[in-house]
Design a protein with these regions (language model features):
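C-terminal catalytic/acceptor-binding lobe
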Residues: 169-335
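Short, acidic, metal-binding catalytic loop of nucleotide-sugar glycosyltransferases
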Residues: 29-39
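Conserved donor-nucleotide/metal-binding helix-loop-beta segment in metal-dependent transferases, i.e.
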Residues: 98-119
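Active-site-proximal specificity loops/subdomain of glycosyltransferases
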Residues: 45-81
């Protein structure tokens, strides 16, 4: 396995914003402790604030007048000079030492095949087996799988990551409505861990549907408080508050959806007396203020409808939606060339 100075190949991109500056000290405290390559450059993507941490090479990339997430992401990526980038979010708090061997191995695998887009830390929810263990501990994500584009930690080929972003995209839109863009590039290959234990970073996301770190802008203290106490990290939880409730979305019935004020996650609706999609949408709009893109898999009997829903840009009215079914992806691609 070829080894050389990793800083020539890899940059760390930490996606954040000024409003989350209180996360930076605990994030970089743990990053410095558990990340083995101190000389690898780090880009902190935020609007206007500056930050430094002793022993780490951090450069803040600012977009003070730009509110669009996609535009800020493209600006940050344009400042990355290395071929590969490790994508991280500001609440991905490392829990264990990162293996040098694993990182070098992934970089060398990517060098050996220029069509590899990423090696992710997130096991894919798909049950399909595809190129399992071609790269030990990983499997290839099947073409056109949902959430192939995602904001989980991953080592990306910088050029390909930049290729998939759009200036107006939010993170939620990018993971869902823009996911069909991968069909325009069938040559690209995406790999994910076979199991969580195979991930090359441990940042606390252990099972599909878990919430950890920061959720809806508030601390998930069930996750972070034991970690911060173990690591002797002091955090003022009052700055952003504590998330008061557990995840309520799994196995939620349409008949009880009134308990949910808004939805930003995949919602499983089952065992409902409501039989038509029209009735479901009417029920959701009655009880939920939905202002951002989301994807809802509806389980009605044995039939699965995957509906992609987004508010039309011309109006902020919650009643205006566009629906893109899987079978309509070709039309979507042709309109986004």
């Amino acid at each position: 396995m070829q080894k050389k100075n990793l800083k020539d190949d890899l940059t760390i991109l930490v996606c954040s914003c000024d409003a989350y500056a209180d996360l930076w000290n605990p994030f970089f405290t743990l990053f410095k402790k558990y990340w083995p390559f101190r000389d690898v450059p780090i880009i902190l993507n935020t609007e206007s604030k500056n930050f430094s941490f002793d022993g780490l090479d951090i450069k803040c990339i600012h977009s003070p007048s730009e509110k669009r997430y996609g535009k800020r992401m493209l600006n940050a990526l344009s400042n990355i000079k290395t071929k590969y980038v490790l994508l991280l979010l500001d609440d991905f708090f490392l829990r264990k030492p990162v293996s040098e061997e694993n990182i070098f191995q992934i970089i060398n695998w990517m060098k050996s095949d220029k069509n590899i887009a990423y090696f992710s830390c997130e096991p894919s929810p798909t049950y399909a087996s595809y190129e399992v263990n071609k790269y030990p501990g990983f499997k290839r994500v099947p073409p056109a799988s949902d959430y192939t584009l995602n904001m989980q930690a991953a080592i990306w080929q910088t050029k390909i990551l930049k290729e998939f972003w759009r200036p107006s995209a939010t993170p939620w839109e990018w993971e869902t409505i823009y996911n069909p863009l991968i069909l325009k590039h069938p040559e690209h290959k995406f790999y994910c861990p076979i199991h969580s234990k195979d991930s090359f970073l441990d940042y606390g996301h252990y099972a599909y549907g878990d919430i950890w770190g920061v959720y809806r802008g508030k601390w998930v203290t069930e996750d972070v408080d034991p970690l911060f106490k173990k690591e002797n990290i002091e955090v003022d939880y009052s700055i952003r508050g504590i998330y008061p409730e557990k995840m309520v979305f799994k196995n939620e019935s349409v008949d009880t959806i009134s308990s949910v004020s808004s939805i930003y996650a995949e919602t499983h609706l089952g065992n409902s007396s409501v039989k038509s999609l029209g009735d479901i949408f009417a029920r959701l709009k009655k009880f939920c203020e939905i202002r951002s893109f989301l994807e809802l898999p509806f389980y009605i009997g044995y039939e699965v409808h995957r509906i992609i829903k987004t508010i039309l840009k011309k109006s902020m009215l919650d009643n205006y939606f566009t629906y893109i079914l899987k079978k309509e992806r070709k039309r979507f691609l042709s309109s986004n060339k």
